[in-house]
Amino acid sequence: MMHPVAGSNPAFCGPGKPSCLNEDAMRAADQFDLYSSQQNKYSHTVSHKPMVCQRQDPLNETHLQPTSGRNIEIKDELKKKKNLNRSGKRGRPSGTTKSAGYRTSTGRPLGTTKAAGFKTSPGRPLGTTKAAGYKVSPGRPPGSIKALSRLADLGYGCGTAAFPYPMMHSRVVHGLQETSGEVKPPSE
């Protein structure tokens, strides 16, 4: 005959746990008697053991910790063995850390992703290669000093306009045209 173990640990024998015998409304001795009479009703014998709330041994917990720590060490060793064949061309060489200053293989700062908005190289959209036909920019924003030097090469001096066609002057510029009702064509 089994005796219920009175557990003092509230994590295993808390209120509302149906498997804890000391928390049930019925008496434990009546429950065991009922179980033995139910077993005699059936012709075949099946060994059913009632669930009993017991305290865990602290020795078991300390025994499990070194094995789980060992599994983590084995996984780390396997990762290190996989990284031995990698060269320095893709990412950083194996055995180095992020704090050593190596950038990722796409040219972004460490710890960033493509979604953060860093381009792979200047002048191309994300996810494209040189073979896709995008020109790599020379490193200057458009409309910078080089564009101004091209205008100087066209041969326009400071006194002449860059636009060779005559332009109509607005009425605001000429005060005389505002007072008179006639519109005079500009003289060339």
Swiss-Prot record:
Residues 80-92 have a biased composition (Basic residues). There is a cross-link at residues 75, 184 (Glycyl lysine isopeptide (Lys-Gly) (interchain with G-Cter in SUMO2)). The keyword Nucleotide-binding does not apply. It comes from the Eukaryota. Residues 80-141 are annotated as: Disordered. Residues 94-107 have a biased composition (Polar residues). Keywords: Isopeptide bond, Phosphoprotein, Ubl conjugation. InterPro entries: DUF5568. The modification Phosphoserine is found at residues 37, 121, 180. It holds the Pfam family DUF5568. The keyword Phosphoprotein applies. Belongs to the UPF0461 family. This is UPF0461 protein C5orf24 homolog. It comes from Mus musculus.
